[in-house]
Each structure stands twice: as C-alpha cells, then as structure tokens.
Amino acid sequence: MSGSSERELASIVRDLGCGPTFWAPTTQRFPGFLAGDKLACAIVNTAGRETGGVHWLAFGWNPRSRTCYMFDPFGFSDRRLKQIYSFEYEAMLRRSAVASSPDRCLSLEQSTQTVQGPDSAACGLFCCMFLHAFVHWPDRPMDGNPTMNLLTGVPNGMLQSPQVLPTLRRNQEELYRFLARHSPYFRSHRAAIEHATAFDKMKQLRVSQ
C-alpha cells in the first residue's frame, strides 16, 4: 500500500480537532461547501474512489471572509493540476459561491509553494496538518501560524531539483513529529503509516515494478 486511506485521514483529522467542521475524505466529485455560514473543511482526492485515488488536496471555507482556501502540498498551479491529474475545481467553487454568498462571490487563496518531496506519498498527511492550521487560525492558515511555520516551502518550479530535497525531507520529518504529538491514531499506527507514506515511496514503487 502507498499513501493514506480515507479512514486514516478521517481518524487523524478528528484527533487534530477538526471533527465538527470536517467533511469525510472525498473524491473529485466533492460538491463544495453548501452550508455557507459555517466554518468547513475537506480533504479531496483528485481522482474517483474507484481508481484507488491519486493525490490529496485540502480545502477550507471561512464564512467570515468568504474565502475558500485550497492547499496542495506540491503547490501546483490550476493548469498543472488539470494537466497532471485531470482535476478541476471550478464547478465546486461555483456551487460553494451560490450556496455560501448572497452576492455569489467568494475569494480563492491557494498554496503556491512545494512542501512535499517529489517521490513522497504523504500528501494526505500534509493535508491533515494544513487543516489543523485552518481550524485554529482560519484567517491565516497558509502561513504565519505555529503549525505551518514548522514547514519550509520552496518554489514549485524547483520540485525536482536535488538542491531542495534536504528541505523537503525535513518537512516530512516535521510532519511526522507534529502528528506524533497531536494524534493518538498516528502514534498507534506510526510504523505502518510512515512506511506507506515514505519520502521515497514512489521511487520504491517504480523500482519494484
């Protein structure tokens, strides 16, 4: 197994205090945030459930500022998300805007830097970490808060550069330490989770094929 299962992510997110605001892990068919007056968040896979999943993203809705946050651990642009994963979220945003805003307008803020290594399978865990930041600091979840300040972002264009691999490896180590402090579920299943989400997991899978 590689990556994180829906059950694992839901258990970790509950441990992180996101339960009341959290939609269960879902797929690219996520309808959007339809209860517009409430803080809400979700972890969404770029593929359908029948595929086994490909890549996890996190979304957060802050009704006070009418802002939708989209967190991608790789920091890909909209164009790259569509190119690599065939993932588009414009329809979800439109449904959220119609349901959540009297004037049908909202702001979108998305991550633009890379915090995850190119061969890492920890995207779902990074999303859990972001949602902890979102729930506790909903007006500044991307950075400038104690949770996300543990990570160091690098320009997305350097994702494949050997120069940034030590930084991205440290990010994954910080991620595991953070979850070990805050999630009993992670502590109980740490060995299996770290094996499935290893920093070089995708490289391991390519070699074994």
UniProtKB/Swiss-Prot annotation:
- Tell me the SUPFAM superfamilies matching this sequence: Cysteine proteinases
Q: What induces it?
A: Expressed in the late phase of the viral replicative cycle.
Q: Where is this site: Cleavage?
A: G52, G53
Q: What is its EC number?
A: 3.4.22.39
Please give the activity regulation comment for this entry.
Requires DNA and protease cofactor for maximal activation. Inside nascent virions, becomes partially activated by binding to the viral DNA, allowing it to cleave the cofactor that binds to the protease and fully activates it. Actin, like the viral protease cofactor, seems to act as a cofactor in the cleavage of cytokeratin 18 and of actin itself.
Report the superkingdom from the record: Viruses
Where does the protein principally reside? Answer: virion
Q: Which UniProt keywords apply?
A: Autocatalytic cleavage, Disulfide bond, DNA-binding, Host nucleus, Hydrolase, Late protein, Protease, Thiol protease, Virion
Which GO biological-process labels does this protein carry?
A: proteolysis
Indicate where this protein resides in the cell.
Virion; Host nucleus
Q: Which Pfam families match?
A: Peptidase_C5 (PF00770)
A cellular component term, taken from the record's GO annotations: host cell nucleus
- The UniProt record lists the keyword Translocase: no
Q: Which residues form the active site?
A: H55, D72, C123
Q: Does the keyword DNA-binding apply?
A: yes
Quaternary structure, per UniProt, is: Interacts with protease cofactor pVI-C; this interaction is necessary for protease activation.
What protein does this entry describe? Answer: Protease
Q: What is the lineage of its organism?
A: Viruses, Varidnaviria, Bamfordvirae, Preplasmiviricota, Tectiliviricetes
